[in-house]
From Swiss-Prot:
SUPFAM superfamilies: Nucleotidylyl transferase
Cleaved signal peptide residues: none
UniProt motif ('KMSKS' region) ranges: 257-261
Cellular component GO terms held in the UniProt record: cytosol
Entry GO MF terms: ATP binding; cysteine-glucosaminylinositol ligase activity; cysteine-tRNA ligase activity; zinc ion binding
PANTHER family: CYSTEINE--TRNA LIGASE, CYTOPLASMIC (PTHR10890:SF3), CYSTEINYL-TRNA SYNTHETASE (PTHR10890)
Protein family membership: Belongs to the class-I aminoacyl-tRNA synthetase family. MshC subfamily.
Protein name in the entry: L-cysteine:1D-myo-inositol 2-amino-2-deoxy-alpha-D-glucopyranoside ligase
Gene from which this protein is expressed: mshC
EC number: 6.3.1.13
Lineage of source species: Bacteria, Bacillati, Actinomycetota, Actinomycetes, Frankiales
Required co-factors: Zn(2+)
Pfam families cross-referenced by the UniProt entry: tRNA-synt_1e
Length: 413
């Protein structure tokens, strides 16, 4: 985050979902990280331009649609709508642009053509591949050995064993039309794009030259981000594609990373249907560093429900301790590589002091919460102490952490 301090506008690009199933907590944790990044940047005075793609044509989507007897476009539309509902429910700040691969086909074709013109692409049968030899910096993002790259490439959608390639690591740029698959016309023949070139083209078209922050899960570091950067840099004849990368750690359930293939998933939509306090769910996710893998359990949500209850009780008090200290502490922790658990601990300290001063019991009433995702600059002075302190802390929690401290009203009330 500190690398962006001098830029008036921060350009964020985050790799989005492949919409063939509902949003699980691993997805939610990933997008929460970049929601938090947006909030910190806006609070520090930056404008933010945020683009997120949607991989709305890809093998897993086509396979699921075929399995379920659905048109792949209908399946994608349904799951995209559910994903956006889940993100809104979790109070994620929406990207300025959601861009589907299907709508981006013309710009993707243009970038593939540029790579062909630069001699960085070649045919294997009717498919078109990118030559990693054209990208001298290939490998600098993931810092993996060649042996590691080959193993991971095979696990994550690559085809290192395909004959005819110049290098086993060369990624697919354009897949020639296959029977029963969607395809689009291009100068290289009808087909559809490879995975990595999609993000290269979308990011360039919507964000211009260099992306300030490129995001996604740790499983996207290689091959996806490595290859996307290589495509963009060779096409532009300049580097870097992105000034910084933030890769979000994996969330596990039952001892394994949450994954659609394994089926060990906790869905946001299921928790919503069960009437889960979504402020508590957001707190449960925020209580983990984005840099370390962690395990989800129901007890985390139970603890978060109790925690948000204490926070709501504290901000409903008629007065409280000075809020300037907690405001400074939350900003300091978030500026340190988005240390959300540290920021929550700072709020806990203020809440404990407020409840102790009030005798430990909650007081009725509610606090008006400020507009989420803005800036707290200018808050302070006499307004940060006494009767104004609870409202300022509520606004802090809303604006910087995205947690709504309005009392939860029972269904049907």
């Amino acid at each position: 985050m500190r690398a962006l301090d001098s830029a008036p506008t921060a350009h964020l690009y985050v790799c989005g979902i492949t919409p063939y199933d509902a949003t699980h907590l691993g997805h939610a944790f990933t997008y929460l990280t970049y929601d938090l990044a947006q909030r910190v940047l806006r609070d520090s005075g930056h404008k933010v331009l945020y683009v997120q793609n949607v991989t709305d044509v890809d093998d897993p989507l086509l396979e699921r649609a075929d399995r379920d007897g659905l048109d792949w476009r209908d399946l994608a539309a349904r799951e995209i709508a559910l994903f956006r509902e889940d993100m809104t429910a979790l109070r994620m700040l929406a990207p300025d642009s959601y861009v589907g691969v299907v709508e981006a086909i013309p710009m993707i074709v243009d970038m593939v053509a540029e790579l062909v013109d630069r001699g960085a692409a070649y045919h294997v049968d009717d498919d078109l591949y990118f030559s990693v030899a054209a990208a001298p910096a290939f490998g600098e993002i993931s810092h993996l050995s060649r042996a590691e790259m080959l193993a991971i490439c095979a696990e994550r959608g690559g085809d290192p064993g395909r004959g005819g390639k110049k290098d086993p690591l060369d990624p697919l740029l354009w897949r020639a039309r296959r029977p029963g698959e969607p395809s689009w016309p291009s100068p290289f023949g009808p087909g559809r794009p490879g995975w990595h070139i999609e993000c290269s083209a979308i990011a360039r078209h919507h964000l211009g030259g260099v992306v300030d922050l490129q995001g996604g899960g740790t499983d996207l570091s290689f091959p996806h981000h490595e290859c996307s950067a290589a495509h963009a840099e060779v096409a532009a004849g300049a580097r870097p594609f992105a000034r910084s990368y933030v890769h979000t750690a994996m969330v596990s359930l039952d001892g394994h990373k949450m994954s659609k293939s394994r089926g060990n998933l906790e869905f946001v939509s299921r928790l919503r249907r069960a009437g889960t306090d979504l402020a508590a769910l957001r707190l449960a996710l925020l209580d983990h560093r984005h840099t370390a893998d962690w395990e989800w359990s129901a007890s985390l949500l139970t603890d978060a429900v109790a925690r948000v209850g204490r926070w709501r009780a504290a901000v409903a008090l008629p007065a409280g301790p000075d809020a300037q200290g907690v405001l400074a502490a939350v900003r300091e922790r978030l500026a340190d590589d988005l240390d959300a658990p540290g920021a929550l601990a700072a709020v806990d300290a203020w809440v404990d002091a407020a409840l102790a001063d009030a005798g430990g019991g909650p007081v009725g009433g509610s606090v008006g919460v400020g507009s989420s995702g803005g800036s707290l600059r200018g808050s302070g002075g006499a307004a940060s102490a006494g009767g104004e302190a609870p409202a300022l802390v509520a606004r802090l929690v809303d604006t910087l952490l995205g947690v709504d401290l309005e009392p939860v009203r029972p269904r049907g009330s």
